[in-house]
């Protein structure tokens, strides 16, 4: 097990997560006692206790007073905040994980973008106008793209969509920095933002669904061509 962590707490967290992932601590089983586990990992019990509480909040474990700590099936108990961790744990599955992430983004954005443009056009236009001054490089576009989708999610009037985008942020922006290094991707995105702005101005809300689906398809084709050179830094860094 190769762990790159910058602190005892970070090391303990990665050790436990990787042990769960590799079935050293399988879902449904009980973690070793606190004293045994702290000695096994090489950290103080105080540090271990803090790590266990954090992992419980993220859905990896269930802690109940007076009972042993139980390992969860994280697919059933965790949230979007573990996406980057999953990317680090299973490099071979990263392309599929990213495909699933982008598919979810397209599917939900057809709903919240249409709602934003129809019910809150001024807010939607304010969000889309931020594309007018973006610098022509990958980092700027990655931040812009995330902020536009997130901004339109909140502009829809349903903050739950915004919270979903918040949960995607880490892996989403890492993907974006790689994807938007391609000038074709930046050009396609600008065209998409401009099209949405035009539809908003015209009140053509019925065209939003197809516009978003088309962008998802076209950007997906660019992304699939780029996957052969997928960088290793999509995984989260050690704490």
Swiss-Prot record:
GO molecular function, one term: DNA-binding transcription factor activity
Entries under CDD domains matching the protein: WHTH_GntR
Keywords: Activator, Cytoplasm, DNA-binding, Fatty acid metabolism, Lipid metabolism, Repressor, Transcription, Transcription regulation
Pfam families: FadR_C (PF07840), GntR (PF00392)
GO BP terms: fatty acid metabolic process; regulation of fatty acid metabolic process
SUPFAM superfamilies named in the record: GntR ligand-binding domain-like, Winged helix' DNA-binding domain
DNA-binding region (UniProt annotation): 34-53
InterPro entries hit by this protein: FA-response_TF_FadR, FadR_C, TF_FadR/GntR_C, Tscrpt_reg_HTH_GntR, WH-like_DNA-bd_sf, WH_DNA-bd_sf
Disulfide bonds: none
Organism domain of life: Bacteria
The keyword Cytoplasm appears for this protein: yes
Subcellular location: Cytoplasm
Oligomer status and interactors: Homodimer.
Functional summary from the UniProt entry: Multifunctional regulator of fatty acid metabolism.
HAMAP family: HTH_FadR
Protein known as: Fatty acid metabolism regulator protein
Organism: Salmonella arizonae (strain ATCC BAA-731 / CDC346-86 / RSK2980)
Gene name linked to the record: fadR
């Amino acid at each position: 097990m190769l762990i790159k962590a910058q602190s005892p707490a970070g090391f303990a967290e990665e050790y436990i997560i990787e042990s769960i992932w590799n079935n050293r601590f399988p879902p449904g089983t009980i973690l070793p006692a606190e004293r045994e586990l702290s000695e096994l990992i090489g950290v103080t019990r105080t540090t271990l206790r803090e790590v266990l509480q954090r992992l419980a909040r993220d859905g990896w474990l269930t802690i109940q007073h007076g009972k042993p700590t139980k390992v969860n099936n994280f697919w059933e108990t965790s949230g979007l905040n573990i996406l980057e961790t999953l990317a680090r744990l299973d490099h071979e599955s990263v392309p599929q994980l990213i495909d699933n992430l982008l598919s979810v983004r397209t599917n939900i954005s057809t709903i919240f973008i249409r709602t934003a443009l129809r019910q809150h056009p001024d807010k939607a236009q304010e969000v889309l106008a931020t594309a007018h001054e973006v610098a022509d490089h990958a980092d700027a576009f990655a931040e812009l793209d995330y902020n536009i989708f997130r901004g339109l999610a909140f502009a829809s009037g349903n903050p739950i969509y915004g919270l979903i985008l918040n949960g995607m942020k880490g892996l989403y922006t890492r993907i974006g920095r790689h994807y938007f290094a391609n000038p074709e991707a930046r050009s396609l995105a600008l065209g998409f933002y401009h099209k949405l702005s035009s539809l908003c101005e015209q009140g053509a809300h019925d065209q939003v669904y197809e516009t978003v689906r088309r962008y998802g398809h076209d950007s997906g084709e660019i992304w699939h061509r780029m996957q052969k050179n997928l960088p290793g830094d999509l995984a989260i860094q050690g704490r």
